[in-house]
Structures are given as C-alpha cells and as structure tokens.
C-alpha cells in the first residue's frame, strides 16, 4: 500500500521532510528530521511500501555514514520488509554494503546478488568501488568461468 493513495497531504509532508533532511550537512540534524518523518508514518508502518521503505532506508544511510552499522542494519531490514511485495534493487545493494561493513560476507554477497539480478551494475554505481570489486570476485569464486582452448 502507498500512503500517497490514502493521504496525499501527509505523504507530501513526509516527502518534504526527507528532502529537507537531505539538504542538511550535520548528520545529527539529518537524522532528527528523518526520524520526525518516520514518526509521521501511520501505524502499522510496515503496511506502507512507501514512504516506509524510503524513510527507513534514509535513516539507515545516516547510521551507515556515522559508522554505526548495527543500527544501520536494523533500519535497512525494515526498509526491505516494507518492500517484500515490491523489491527494490537499490535497497538490496544498501543491505549488502552494510553486511559487508559488518564482516558478514555471506549476506553481503546474497544482497549484492539480488541487486545485480535486478538492475545489473546500476545500484553499485552509487557506492564505493570496493563493493563491486567484492561482488565480482566472490561471483567468480563461486562460478568460475571456463577457459576456452584455442
């Protein structure tokens, strides 16, 4: 379900807060505004594909920037849960990056693979190159290319 279809004014208010938060330079200020947007989402929050997934993913991103990967993971998993019926490759890639930073390479690869299957390289293009390098290397290790003889 999309909040915009049920209450477009509230959805616009939440979107305005997210846009405002993205313009702020202080991580603490960005987090405070994103949490304010989160608190405006009607309960049960996970019933709304949007704005729940984008707000939760945005909050996750702030925690990721702060280096608090455990909390970032909690939020990105909420974003994924809200998107169960409509997956989003960019959130898969974000989850992969967080798992990577937590040292959970199995889950990192799993989510990078989901992102790649959906949109190929595109979601990786917004992230540090190390995630793409990891994904390519792990994919090759798991599925070695057969060398052709000339």
Predicted regions, residues:
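Flexible helix-coil transition and linker loops at the boundaries of alpha-helical arrays
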Residues: 2-8, 39-50, 80-88, 122
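Residue-level detector of the short coil/turn that links helix A to helix B
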Residues: 25-28, 67, 103
């Amino acid at each position: 379900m999309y909040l915009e279809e049920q209450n477009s004014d509230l959805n616009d208010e939440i979107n305005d807060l997210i846009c405002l938060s993205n313009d702020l330079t202080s991580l603490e200020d960005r987090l405070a505004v994103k949490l304010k947007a989160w608190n405006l989402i009607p309960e049960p929050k996970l019933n709304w594909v949007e704005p729940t997934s984008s707000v939760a993913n945005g909050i996750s991103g702030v925690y990721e920037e702060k280096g608090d990967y455990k909390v970032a993971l909690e939020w990105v998993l909420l974003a994924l849960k809200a998107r169960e019926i409509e997956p989003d490759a960019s959130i898969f890639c974000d989850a992969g990056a967080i798992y990577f930073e937590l040292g959970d390479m199995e889950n990192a690869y799993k989510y990078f693979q989901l992102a790649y299957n959906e949109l190929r390289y595109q979601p990786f293009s917004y992230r540090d190159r190390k995630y793409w390098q990891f994904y390519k290397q792990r994919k090759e290790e798991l599925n070695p290319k057969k060398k052709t003889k000339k």
